[in-house]
Amino acid sequence: VNAQVKFFTDVNSKQIKTLQVKVAGELISEPYIALGGEEQIEINFDGLGSGYTRYAYNVVHCNADWTQSQLSPIEYMNGFQGTTIDDFANSIGTTTQYSNYRLLLPNDDVQFKVSGNYAIQVYNEDTPDQIIFTACFSVVEPVVNISASVSGNTDIDTNQSHQQVSFNINNKNFPITYPQTDLKIFVYQDNRRDNAVTDLQPMSILENQISYTYNLSLI
């Protein structure tokens, strides 16, 4: 995998439909879980055709910008690459034949050792070099508290078409020596990564609180 390629949740095959990546048990949710927690990521998709297809997956650990990290699999996961997806159900009485597949992570075969961004690359076991889709999610460690607010009062207008996003990081239990360089901040609009705001610098740095307020990039 090219280390400079940024991973996105993306489908590369016309045989794959209705891909969903979410927290298991939730109808709609942002795809992130806590490291070592009880929750699981659910990857759900339909594969067109009659009968079971042996789909397998590899786990890729990513940097903050979703490029592949330099960690080796043994450093970020317990288990083996190339595990098959065996939880499936064939369609019954439908015009188009398909099978629904579900993958839960972590599971008995794969567990995460470290937090970070992850990309699951799924392929037909017969053609391992052809990735049919990629599913992205995050595994987090809640070592700081983040409080955020949205205001209609901005430097552009007041209570009209713009809003100001502000947030504070309470790092009382997690010392950060140089927040200007040690922190990588990404602000997404409705989980969109195409217009993410990055490279933010704090407005103020106190002993236990780092504030990002009145930033024009967050309007």
Where are these regions (language model features)?
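Contiguous beta-strand segments within globular domains
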Residues: 13-61, 157-171
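Short acidic/polar inter-strand loop motif in beta-rich domains
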Residues: 64-66, 110-111, 124-132, 192-193
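Low-complexity, Pro/Ser/Thr- and charge-rich linker/hinge segments at domain boundaries
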Residues: 8-10, 139-162
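Bacterial Sec-dependent N-terminal signal peptides
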Residues: 1-6
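Extended low-complexity, serine/threonine- and proline-enriched intrinsically disordered segments
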Residues: 51-79, 177-200
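Short, aromatic- and glycine-rich surface loops/edge beta-strands on solvent-exposed regions
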Residues: 57-59, 116-122, 218-219
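Aromatic sugar-binding surface patches on proteins
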Residues: 84-87, 92-106, 205-219
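Ligand-binding face of N-terminal immunoglobulin V-set domains in extracellular IgSF glycoproteins
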Residues: 95-125
